[in-house]
């Protein structure tokens, strides 16, 4: 039998060993804490280095801001395809952002201000207001050194490096010439339906059309309008319905933009195609109506080429090259007879072109 003293000695040794183990664990914990702290410092340093490297990479990459008049119509998506193709061809990143309405001046100003803060390489824009957008765009170019290119629109100022657009008045006159060919000397009442009163593009087309119809003083032609449906197809449809009730002898319709054309098409279809109808900016949903002759003729812009050329000019300015101050992109007349020809499809379906 072991003595109590021996047991106490054994217990003492056991306690001593336990103390050593505890102390060892404490040391290991301290070591682990130090290792964890060191690991965290290294990770933070690496993350900071990566963030700096990424920022430098983004700066070197060069971003071109492209701001359409709105994102409301298919037309602007075709413009976007053109801008992105130019970016791809020249090695630039395109940031395409727009508002939901083509009358949102404050929203478009905010987009420009955001792009200025980001320090983009250039701004390509279709201004919603040719006067209201002047201060912020002038600030971008003259105070921050960001070149400004106007795309499919107008700015009542001379500082932008270049403007790439359809000549809207000429496009309207072209439509008027086609309408005269269709109606002949007999003439008749023609309704002109536009989008927003005061809009530069649509207003130019409407005025060009009216100028052409009336230039020879032909009393056989009577212009009704322009009427404004805000580019909304249902409002435009209602306008045309009211016009037909008040003017059962209405012979023809000219619509000035994509939304107006979509709305007028609803009314023309209800009339069984009895009206002569020329539509500006036909979208993909209207192509079959052109094939069927419900839309007698359509005046198509080339949004892909407008977007591509405007972006290309921005890149040239960035690279120190000279660009043309004003570039007019021609329109194309589309009918049932030519809609499926390759050169027409290249204008109407730019998605397919970019994928070839």
What does each of the following model-derived ranges do?
Residues 27-40:
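Positively charged n-region of N-terminal signal peptides that target proteins for export
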Residues 39-48:
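Bacterial N-terminal signal peptides
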């Amino acid at each position: 039998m072991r003595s109590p003293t021996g047991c106490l000695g054994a217990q003492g040794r056991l306690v001593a060993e336990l103390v050593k183990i505890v102390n060892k664990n404490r040391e290991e914990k301290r070591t682990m804490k130090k290792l964890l702290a060191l690991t965290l410092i290294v990770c933070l340093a690496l993350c900071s280095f990566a963030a700096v490297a990424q920022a430098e990479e983004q700066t070197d990459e060069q971003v071109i801001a492209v701001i359409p008049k709105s994102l409301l119509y298919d037309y602007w998506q075709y413009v976007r395809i053109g801008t992105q193709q130019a970016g791809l061809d020249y090695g630039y990143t395109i940031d395409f952002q727009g508002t939901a309405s083509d009358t949102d001046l404050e929203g478009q100003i905010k987009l420009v201000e955001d792009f200025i803060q980001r320090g983009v390489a250039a701004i390509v824009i279709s201004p919603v207001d040719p006067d209201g957008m002047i201060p912020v765009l002038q600030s971008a170019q003259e105070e921050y050194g960001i070149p400004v290119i106007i795309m499919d629109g107008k700015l009542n100022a001379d500082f932008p490096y270049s403007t790439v657009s359809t000549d809207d008045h000429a496009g309207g006159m072209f439509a008027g010439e086609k309408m005269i060919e269709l109606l002949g000397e007999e003439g008749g009442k023609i309704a002109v339906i536009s989008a927003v009163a005061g809009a530069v593009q649509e207003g130019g087309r409407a005025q060009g059309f009216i100028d052409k119809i009336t230039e020879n003083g032909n009393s056989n032609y009577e212009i009704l309008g322009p009427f404004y449906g805000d580019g909304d197809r249902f409002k435009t449809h209602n306008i045309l319905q009211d016009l037909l009730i008040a003017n059962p002898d209405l012979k023809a319709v000219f619509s000035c933009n994509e939304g107006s054309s979509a709305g007028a098409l609803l009314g023309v279809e209800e009339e069984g195609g009895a009206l002569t109808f020329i539509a500006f900016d036909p979208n993909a949903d209207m192509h079959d109506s052109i094939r069927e002759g419900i839309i007698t003729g359509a005046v198509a812009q080339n949004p892909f080429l407008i977007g591509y050329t405007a972006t290309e000019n921005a890149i040239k300015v960035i690279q120190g090259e000279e660009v043309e101050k004003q570039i007019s992109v021609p329109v194309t007349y589309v009918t049932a007879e030519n809609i499926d020809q390759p050169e027409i499809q290249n204008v109407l379906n730019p998605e397919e072109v970019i994928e070839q």
